[in-house]
Amino acid sequence: MNKILLFLFLSFSAFAQNRFEKEILAYEKQDSIAMPAKGMKLFIGSSSFRLWKNFDADTKGMNAFNRGFGGSTLKEALYYFDRMVASYQPSWVFMYEGDNDLTSGTSPEEIASQFEEFSARLAKQVPGAKLVFVYARPSLDRAANKAKQQDLNQRITAIAAKKKGHFVIDMHSPFYNPDGTLMQDIFVADRLHLNEKGYVIFAKQIQNFIRQHAQ
């Protein structure tokens, strides 16, 4: 009985610590059938990547693949680094993390520190790979986080400016009207995630970057 209880406890603990394990396993199963080639552009991050329905069409000819998972955080991207980054040996890594982190109470300073850890691991395990941080974007649901998002984006920009092969993409300012108000018609019903119109803007920012820097 004690062994059974211990097994159940360990199983529950592992599940609790790895809330997106099922998604990661699904990607690994997909990879076992068709593994992405080395040297591609990897997109890893939270639901802004995961819910990008037109990703394949929007990145056609750009040698890219998407491994967005859950509503992940940068800490979770670090946790799955070996399986979801190093295993692919990409030439570019596009990251969208930070937004959920701020909402869960992680400070911009701590997220920036985690970004530097991610950068260091990338340099060690995938030598020569370039790293692109996609700015935390605004939303109606998280309007109160605007200042923290801007703080985080500025911190990452400062880090990237000092590191070779590091870049940022402004995914914050494009969602505002000329009068400074946040666009109202680019979100789905939850007022957080982007709708089709929102993803047109989202995709354009990334497409423009790739054409200018990563072709």
PLM region descriptions:
Residues 1-42, 49, 53, 57-60, ...:
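N-terminal secretory targeting modules
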